[in-house]
Amino acid sequence: MPITLDKKLPAVDILKSENIFVMDDKRAIHQDIRPMSILILNLMPTKVATETQLLRLLANTPLQLSVDFLYMTSHHSKTTQAEHMKTFYKTFKDIKDNYYDGLIITGAPVETMPFEKVDYWEELCQVFQWSKTHVYSTLHLCWGAQAGLYYRYSVDKVQMTDKLSGIYLQKVNEQLSPLMRGFDDCFLSPHSRYTEVLLKDINNKTNLEILASGEKVGLSILASRDMREVYSFGHLEYDRETLDNEYKRDLKAGKSPKIPENYYQDDDVTTHPIMRWNLAAATFFSNWINYAVYQETPYRLEELEKDISFYGYL
């Protein structure tokens, strides 16, 4: 089934050119089913690229999805046209009375700052609190994962000696988790970050399950047993060129970045980056939509205000 989107959204033409089926509201209304309602809080400066990456993966499911985009009014974007935000994004005030089956909170290039120093931190905390009673499952990505852990469990991020940038091997630790269903024992994923969350803090302060981890990346994917909270420190949503674009951006800014590891053929930055995480990305996002959202969310989303039964893995 397709994603229902505003046909004027720039990502629509890109997805159609890749033979991904999307449709507008007029066509969707004729399908007599309740679509899964997904909210994406896009904190990345590359708004259109991130929209396209996430929608590409969400479209890889047999379910009809209805997607809203959210932005923080306390932050003024320097890289995205105001007209784009006004046309395709909603504010927290617009959606605070709505209910959603799933929420995705993206990463953001603010990880070296203390959380409280981020200009939209208070507004983001409102979203975290609201999501407990208005969203069934929240998928936190990279800095979004670190922010969610800090808000919910007071687990702080720790500065790394060097930036972690490249494609890294991770091991599946919980084979029985629905989120890891269909994965090989090990998988590759992009990572791009200066900070990490420590295993001892997760063990001491939370009851989260460690679904995947790696020797170089440390913790990779965490989740609560009922999958209402999912945390991914990598960037499975990244497309082929994203790390290349980040490397060249930092090079141009005079930051002397290291070449992303395990990314270019023979570490030659003039070569076409090798795509090796597409299957893992498609599997993970499909599992989240199917098992964490569709199989568990109540038909009447208003019931999220109450205690929700968890049907379990098997």
UniProtKB/Swiss-Prot annotation:
Substrate binds at K163, S192, R249. Its EC number is 2.3.1.31. Pfam families: HTS. Gene3D superfamilies: 3.40.50.880. It catalyses: L-homoserine + acetyl-CoA = O-acetyl-L-homoserine + CoA. GO terms for molecular function: homoserine O-acetyltransferase activity; homoserine O-succinyltransferase activity. InterPro entries: Class_I_gatase-like, HST_MetA, MetA_family. Pathway: Amino-acid biosynthesis; L-methionine biosynthesis via de novo pathway; O-acetyl-L-homoserine from L-homoserine: step 1/1. The record marks E111 as: Important for acyl-CoA specificity. Transmembrane segments: none annotated. GO terms for biological process: L-methionine biosynthetic process from homoserine via O-succinyl-L-homoserine and cystathionine. It is found in: Cytoplasm. Belongs to the MetA family. Transfers an acetyl group from acetyl-CoA to L-homoserine, forming acetyl-L-homoserine. This is Homoserine O-acetyltransferase. It comes from Streptococcus mutans serotype c (strain ATCC 700610 / UA159).
